[in-house]
A protein has these predicted regions:
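A short, well-structured juxtamembrane/interface segment
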Residues: 45-52
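Major-groove recognition helix of helix-turn-helix-like DNA-binding domains
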Residues: 14-31
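Single, function-defining residue in the core of a domain
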Residues: 1, 28-31, 38-42, 57-61, ...
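Short secondary-structure boundary/capping segments within folded domains
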Residues: 14-16, 53-54, 91
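DNA-recognition alpha helix
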Residues: 1-15
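Short hydrophobic/aromatic segments of transmembrane alpha-helices and their interfaces
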Residues: 7, 53, 233-234
Length: 325
């Protein structure tokens, strides 16, 4: 809209300056990925205001951590750097890059991210990313593939509250049953054979039954919120399913932002990483505009359509390009 207002400077005659594909490619190569990574580190942040609907639970900012993979161009250098995922027959058609993201559930804003080859584990990536990005006002949710004593301990040390699903075979003997049906237990490092350096957790077991079938899904959550009055088990069980907001975020920048393209176009690992940081920054910019629009109307940003916002921005882009630099 700002650019539309400036069109009078050129008498409405400004023409878009078209750069060739070769010029863009050369400029991207000169820029490299590190600048984009540093820019993301400075720009990506939580954006929910204290009164934002759907973004908070009892004073804690709702966050989720998860990972996803993206196909990259099937070039030899990309294949060597990123690697292929396993397939039932042979190997996948494309190498894949792994992206780990810390997301603010209420606004769908990616507040921190990490990019690595396919073979890197999400747990190792989280251990490197989370300690510096978590804060004491956060309640962070994660699925059962993330739990490990060392990562749990690192995340707890940040001061953040955690609500993580764990696998059903994790030994969590009850030590004290609480009034809300949850119970206290202690987790240990698998290397701690003497079991002297454990960490107390609160365990919440529950099942979800599909009304259409007799099948029940069992869930086991652990949290470092030990006081049931501060966060009752029933509320935490319901809250955990807000973690699925992060799946929508991955769908937004993997599918909607890239239209029909399912494979990143960059031909080298450096440019793949640069492209991914660019996508993350563009996604943040869109989500920030949506948050501002929702806040003015007192709405939950979930009420707004990401696809519609993206279309509006795309319609404005040619007008912005019409203003010479």
């Amino acid at each position: 809209m700002v650019c539309e207002g400036l069109q009078w400077l050129s008498g409405g005659q400004a023409g878009a300056l078209q750069a060739s594909k070769s010029a863009i490619s050369q400029a991207r190569s000169r820029l490299g990925p590190e600048v984009m990574k540093q820019l993301a580190a400075r720009v990506l942040r939580p954006m929910a205001r204290p009164d934002a609907p759907g973004a908070w639970y009892r004073g804690w900012r709702l966050m989720a951590v998860d990972g996803s993979c993206m196909d990259v161009a099937d070039e030899a250098v990309n294949a060597e750097h990123f690697g292929y995922p396993a397939a039932s027959r042979g190997q996948s058609a494309f190498p894949q890059a792994r992206v780990l993201a810390l997301v603010e559930c209420g606004t769908h804003a990616v507040v921190a991210a990490s990019i690595a080859p396919y073979g890197h584990s999400e747990v190792a990536m989280a251990a490197e990313l989370l300690p510096a990005k978590l804060a004491g006002d956060m309640l962070v949710m994660a699925d059962r593939n993330f739990y490990g004593f060392k990562l749990w301990q690192k995340a707890c040390a940040s001061g953040a509250k955690l609500l993580w699903r764990v696998k059903s075979n994790l030994g969590l003997p009850g030590q004290h049953e609480l009034a809300d049906g949850s119970y206290l237990s202690t987790v240990y490092d698998s290397d701690d054979r003497t079991r002297r350096s454990g960490q107390q957790v609160r365990v919440i077991d529950y099942t979800l039954k599909d009304s259409a079938t007799p099948v029940q899904d069992s869930y086991r959550l652990v949290t470092n919120i030990l006081d049931p009055e501060a966060a009752p088990a029933l509320e935490l069980a319901a809250l955990y399913h807000e973690r699925w907001e992060i799946e929508s975020v991955f769908d937004e920048f993997k599918t909607h932002m890239r239209s029909a393209s399912t494979v990143l176009r960059s031909k080298t690992p450096e440019l793949v990483e640069q492209e991914l940081w660019g996508l993350l920054l563009a996604h943040f910019a869109i989500r920030q505009l949506m948050e501002q629009a929702a806040w003015r109307q007192g709405l939950d940003p979930d009420r707004l359509s990401f696809v519609h916002a993206l279309r509006v921005i795309k319609r404005k882009m040619p007008q912005a390009a019409a203003i010479p630099p």
